[in-house]
Curated annotation (Swiss-Prot):
ATP binds at residue 523. NCBIfam families: PRK05729.1 (NF004349), valS (TIGR00422). Its EC number is 6.1.1.9. Keywords: Aminoacyl-tRNA synthetase, ATP-binding, Coiled coil, Cytoplasm, Ligase, Nucleotide-binding, Protein biosynthesis. GO terms for cellular component: cytosol. It is found in: Cytoplasm. Belongs to the class-I aminoacyl-tRNA synthetase family. ValS type 1 subfamily. This is Valine--tRNA ligase. The keyword Protein biosynthesis applies.
Length: 884
């Protein structure tokens, strides 16, 4: 047991050193109990590109909540940590650092550059692990993995070779998405489409005989040097007689043919389309059909090459301006038509993606997708939470394209293909024997290795590996909806292909962390928040409580410091309740408390309030467990908050003072037992969410770590509807009296007469038997409970289930004075309503103010109207009393 709780809750003191203690005690490792059911999670590996953000904190908090609860429930739990090499992202970061020193990766060469990247990886991996510790993540570091570990690399090579041998990986020249900044290919889902201002540039291509011109339009005139034809629809009567003739490509005066192809739409524009097979996917397909040459006019960095004539070496966008100016000077520019269109941008570097002809490696997706789709109709299907994301997954799998997996980078899994001087290619898990072989310089898409994460981390391809046999398939994956396509889908089809099983049973999808205004957090907006800064101010438990309590599967969460204040206040409340209970504990042990509680539920000792709180505790255990099973942590948090603050702290703890401040030692022991037992159960329920503070308090009265303590279970013997119904009626009575006092502005300290009329004999007896509680909470001068009470002429009346409550007002209230006070209050609310109404009737304000500002004013209006109406009602009531 640890030292006594400090008078004030200080998260820094509570959390300092605790994580290292857990690590020293090995409490995060699997139990090794072969009789226990296994439950495993693999952490979505963060990129070693920098520090973790608030989204990572949310993602890992949810996983930790799940694994801590399952550990307490007796499962043999494994939460496997690890990190992703993040090829393009990490390489870009290291290259940026080198540029600041005036060095490029080419200056260093591949081997020395990779040494620099490994240094970066070690630096940021240490930072990430430190942040995991601050968050309190109960991962098993003895099983930590990295996507470039040799074991995982072996798995990657095997998967590549097996798919290649099946004909499902192939190499070919196709139009791909090219990132000129990173100088690498991108898959379709690594391209973010944004609406940008652009233009259609209309230009004339003159027939070779000079008889007429054909007007074509393009958004990328700089690619015209790669034009190898113009196409018209074979059924378009305007151009039928021109098919087979040539037009002259402006600026370079090169003749290119007019071809017939249905790609040209007679209804769109002039019906004439320029064909640039090396720079447009549709044109590439046309070129394939007509056996056209493929002319690439750009370098891999987005500059124009020597085929662009005088524009050689210019950046593509500068070349665009220069080409348009040249066309205008030559008389070939017809018009510029401004418009907004969707343009692809690199997810990693943010630059405009260039469609580019390139030789790349691809995964053929047809059969892999069919397997994944078919699996969702079996007992082995992956369950999505919420279920609507199954539709998202299925839609993507049904419409998936072949996956370009090669990247023109140095950091990553180098493609296991080798070439010799004779033009031969060898694909294998190991290098070919003999000299003269050169390995493909490209690396694999990061997501290729990440797709194997759930089983490669468990020892696969060794299917006899202990962890693979014990913990695969994994139980639950927690991740954001933004990477269902990138990662979740790929893990599913790769796992089905190579293990014959789904990679995980459940996928919990969460949303994004947004700021108070609902905006996505980003560097450009400057609204990003470092979770470590939040932890420094509020503690990890408060952040974890906010992240869990504010979340519903699939929904976004808005971060606010107001919510963080509320989270801290809740933990502070728990701390203060705990201090009160432990200070009055008088050496009572948890085992003694359990024995006494058993007697309470059997009605051998204790009072009705003891049985009421134990009944409600039991209901809370059931509801929280059910919510956890559905991954509805926000619902669980609401249930816990209400029970702890409202029922336990505000009611039961206050009710116990009646006993604890008495001279009855036997009753005191029972009350202390119920208090300690209930606190213990609360801490166990809270531990998965608030590990640090619950461990600190648990250590005051129990041995060992709460990490390995058993999780509460529903106990049928605790159910007591009679006690529940009785105390709820008692609470209703007390609340009613308090509300009536407040309505007529009578101070709680002023003694009053309370008359309770009920025809329910059981309720009458219950109220009389527990009148001490009524008196403690309502401060009556006189309390009368009877079925024979007659309502006084001047009284506040309220009705609860089974009873009427009268508060005689004759000696308490000057009706005239109260009416005058209420009239002033009414005028105040009318003034507020006039002010907000004037603002909302201002069309300029409504049109120009931020939506959230307008909504705030509308909320004020609703609040003021409610208060205005309530005041009117009170005035009418006072007038009625006055007339009576």
């Amino acid at each position: 047991m640890s030292k006594e709780l400090s008078p004030k809750y200080n998260p820094a003191e509570v959390e300092e050193g605790r994580y290292q203690t857990w690590l020293d005690q090995d409490v995060f490792k699997p139990s090794g109990d072969t009789e226990a059911k296994p439950y495993s999670i693999v952490i979505p590996p963060p990129n070693v590109t920098g520090k973790l953000h608030l989204g990572h904190a949310w993602d890992t908090t949810l996983q930790d909540i799940i694994i801590r609860q399952k550990r307490m429930q007796g499962f043999d739990t494994l939460w496997l940590p690890g990190m992703d090499h993040a090829g393009i992202a990490t390489q870009a970061k290291v290259e940026e650092r080198l540029r600041e020193q005036g060095i490029s990766r080419y200056d260093l060469g591949r081997e020395k550059f990779l040494d620099k990247v490994w240094e970066w990886k070690d630096e940021y991996a240490a930072t990430i692990k430190s942040q995991w510790g601050k968050m309190g993540l109960s991962v098993d570091y003895s099983r930590e993995r990295f996507t470039l570990d040799e074991g995982l690399s072996k798995a990657v090579r095997k998967v590549f070779v097996d798919l290649y041998n099946k004909g499902w990986i192939y190499r070919g020249e196709f139009i791909i998405n090219w990132d000129p900044a990173a100088r690498t290919a991108l898959s379709d889902i690594e391209v973010i489409h944004k609406d940008v201002e652009g233009a259609f540039y209309h230009m004339n291509y003159m027939l070779e005989d000079g008889s007429r011109a054909l007007e074509v339009a393009t958004t990328r005139p700089e690619t015209m040097f790669g034009d190898v034809a113009v196409a018209v629809n074979p059924e378009d009567p305007r151009y039928k007689d021109l098919i087979g003739q040539n037009v002259i490509l402006p600026i370079i005066n090169k003749p290119i043919p007019i071809i017939a192809d249905e790609h040209a739409d007679p209804e769109f524009g002039t019906g004439v389309v320029k064909i640039t097979p090396a720079h447009d996917p549709n044109d590439f397909a046309v070129g394939q059909r007509h056996n056209l040459p493929q002319v690439n006019v750009m370098n891999d960095d987005g500059t124009m090459n020597e085929l662009a004539d005088e524009f050689n070496g210019m950046d593509r966008f500068e070349a665009r301006k220069a080409v348009v100016a040249k066309l205008e000077s030559l008389g070939n520019l017809v018009k510029i038509e401004k418009m907004t269109h969707s343009v692809g941008h690199s997810e990693r570097t943010g630059v405009v993606v260039e469609p580019r002809l390139s030789t790349q490696w691809f995964v053929k997706m047809d059969q892999l997708a069919k397997n994944a789709i078919a699996n969702q109709d079996t007992e082995d299907k992956v369950e999505f939470y919420p279920p609507r994301f199954n539709d998202t997954f299925m839609s993507w799998m049904e419409n998936v394209h072949d996956w370009v997996i090669s990247r023109q980078l140095w950091w990553g899994h180098q493609i296991p293909a080798w070439y010799n001087v004779n033009g031969e290619m060898y694909v294998g898990e190991d290098a070919p024997e003999g000299d003269g072989w050169t390995q493909d310089e490209d690396v694999l898409d990061t997501w290729f290795s990440s797709a194997l994460w759930p089983f490669s981390t468990m020892g696969w391809p060794d299917t006899e590996a202990a962890d693979f046999k014990r913990y695969f398939p994994t139980s639950t994956l927690v991740t954001g909806y933004d990477i269902i396509f990138f990662w979740v889908s790929r893990m599913i089809f790769q796992s089905l292909e190579f293990t014959g099983r789904q990679p995980f049973s459940n996928v919990l999808i969460h949303g994004l962390i947004r700021d108070e205004e609902g905006r996505k957090m980003s560097k450009s907006l400057g609204n990003g928040i470092d979770p470590m800064d939040v932890i420094e101010k509020y503690g990890a438990d408060a952040l974890r409580w906010f992240l869990s309590n504010g979340s519903a599967p699939g929904q976004d969460v808005r971060f606010s410091y107001e919510k963080m204040d509320a989270s801290w206040n809740f933990i502070n409340k728990i701390w203060n309740i705990s201090r009160y209970i432990l200070m009055n504990n008088e050496g009572l042990t948890l085992d003694q408390a359990r024995e006494n509680v058993e007697k309470v539920v059997n009605s051998q000792v204790g009072n009705v309030t003891d049985r009421w709180i134990l009944h409600n505790l039991n209901e809370t255990v059931g509801k929280v467990t059910e919510s956890f099973d559905k991954f509805e942590f926000g619902v669980a948090g609401h249930i816990l908050y209400n029970f702890i603050w409202e029922e336990f702290a505000n009611w039961y703890v206050e009710l116990t003072k009646e006993v604890l401040y008495s001279d009855n030692e036997d009753e005191k022991v029972v009350t202390r037992s119920v208090l300690l037992y209930t606190l213990d159960q609360i801490l166990r329920l809270l531990h998965p969410i608030m590990p640090f503070v619950t461990e600190e308090i648990f250590g005051q009265y129990a041995e060992g770590s709460i990490v390995l303590a058993s999780y509460p279970q529903v106990n049928a013997t605790f159910e007591n509807q009679t006690a529940h119904k009785g105390v709820e009626s008692l609470k209703d009575l007390i609340r009613s009296v308090r509300n009536s006092r407040a309505e007529v502005n009578v101070a709680p300290s002023k003694p009053i007469t309370i008359l309770v009329k009920t025809s329910d004999s059981e309720l009458e007896s219950f109220f009389k038997d527990n009148s001490n509680y009524i008196k403690r909470f309502t401060n009556p001068e006189t309390l009368e409970i009877s079925s024979a009470i007659t309502a006084p002429e001047l009284a506040m009346t309220s009705i609860i289930t089974g009873a009427e409550i009268f508060l005689p007002l004759a000696d308490l209230l000057n009706v005239e004075e109260e009416l005058a006070r209420l009239e002033k209050e009414l005028a105040k609310w009318q003034k507020e309503l006039n002010m907000v109404g004037k603002k909302l009737s201002n069309e300029r304000f409504v049109a120009n103010a931020k939506p959230e500002v307008v909504q705030k004013e509308k909320d004020k209006q609703t609040d003021y109207q409610t208060k205005y109406d309530a005041t009117i009602a009170r005035i009418e009531e006072m007038k009625k009393l006055n007339n009576d």
